[in-house]
Amino acid sequence: MTAQTPIHVYSEIGKLKKVLLHRPGKEIENLMPDYLERLLFDDIPFLEDAQKEHDAFAQALRDEGIEVLYLETLAAESLVTPEIREAFIDEYLSEANIRGRATKKAIRELLMAIEDNQELIEKTMAGVQKSELPEIPASEKGLTDLVESNYPFAIDPMPNLYFTRDPFATIGTGVSLNHMFSETRNRETLYGKYIFTHHPIYGGGKVPMVYDRNETTRIEGGDELVLSKDVLAVGISQRTDAASIEKLLVNIFKQNLGFKKVLAFEFANNRKFMHLDTVFTMVDYDKFTIHPEIEGDLRVYSVTYDNEELHIIEEKGDLAELLAANLGVEKVDLIRCGGDNLVAAGREQWNDGSNTLTIAPGVVVVYNRNTITNAILESKGLKLIKIHGSELVRGRGGPRCMSMPFEREDI
């Protein structure tokens, strides 16, 4: 990394030097059973324990010499002038789907009254309950205020924010500022916009943009993997469509970030396998975790760029051989989540046994709960850093989902 290129990520396994996290906050306490599906959750984590688990995760990374950054801090540091701060509030409000002018005015006054920038950022993440606002006179209520009177939020919370992998993705020296699958999560990308536009270190055009949040097609960071300085992998999944991938790849090739080929993985479109990194991650030069349930239906396309056109070929044959050929290694070992046991594979994939964070070649952060997969990884010679995640996992994400590398050593 240099002052001119503050992002440097050319692999999934190079020694991790700097990483972005988000400590779960009050947005988790704004989850409630009636609206879990709307907010993309299956259960409600206990915030106090989730924070303890997340703090232990962050400390485990620091113990390995990794600098830990926080989304909420960088976003606060990006509000460098009163004008930018006010613009952020107005843009946040414009995307918050607020019902009624009087409600919007009251929320704006609430946010403008918060003096501390980090407190402001954390409030926007937490959402706004209607009970926090002054009573709106009946004469000022619109039809939507009356019809939706039982819905408790004036602005929905953003409980998925601790999965920092998805709203944007670092690729080489650039960043893909994503347009996300759901309205609930798409608001999260606003923080990345302000960081990469206004932050003293990461803003001001220092980081090339290879995708923009204003695109109409969807892509998420869990489907964007940097296999090497030459090869990317992208997932065509529940959350990422093929049209977005084509736009992303054209931009990456045009910006000359160094990549020569992309492997596009098409697999089952469902919540269980919402992103490529929930079923497939790189853990060493020649080793990957994979969920066995995707192997039968998996289709892989090689994409290159020449004469200002994408060239796409569907690959046939063995996945391990394809990966070995593209990574320049003799052979690749695909390590199956849960081993050969169908029940263990399903259970441990649901608990993110395949969603590993590699912090150096062969050194991997995992949830301790996935005992069968972990034992297999250790039998392959991998060093595991095991973290507790009984509350964190309720959001359906593991160590890779909860982290966004900003700097890795080259391999």
Curated annotation (Swiss-Prot):
Subunit structure of this chain's protein:
Homodimer.
Q: What terms describe the molecular function in GO for this protein?
A: arginine deiminase activity
Highest taxon of the lineage = Bacteria
GO biological process annotations for this chain's record?
A: arginine catabolic process to ornithine; arginine deiminase pathway
In what pathway does it function? Amino-acid degradation; L-arginine degradation via ADI pathway; carbamoyl phosphate from L-arginine: step 1/2
The record places the active site at C401
Short name of one Pfam family for this protein?
A: ADI
Q: Protein name, please?
A: Arginine deiminase
Q: What does this protein do?
A: Antitumor protein. Has a powerful and dose-dependent inhibitory effect on antigen, superantigen, or mitogen-stimulated human peripheral blood mononuclear cell (PBMC) proliferation. It may inhibit cell proliferation by arresting cell cycle and inducing apoptosis.
User: Encoded by which gene?
Assistant: arcA
Q: How is it modified after translation?
A: Glycosylated.
Main location, first listed in the record: cytoplasm
Assigned keywords, A-Z? Arginine metabolism, Cytoplasm, Glycoprotein, Hydrolase
Q: Which reaction does it catalyse?
A: L-arginine + H2O = L-citrulline + NH4(+)
**What family is it from?**
Belongs to the arginine deiminase family.
- Transmembrane ranges? none
Q: Where in the cell is it found?
A: Cytoplasm
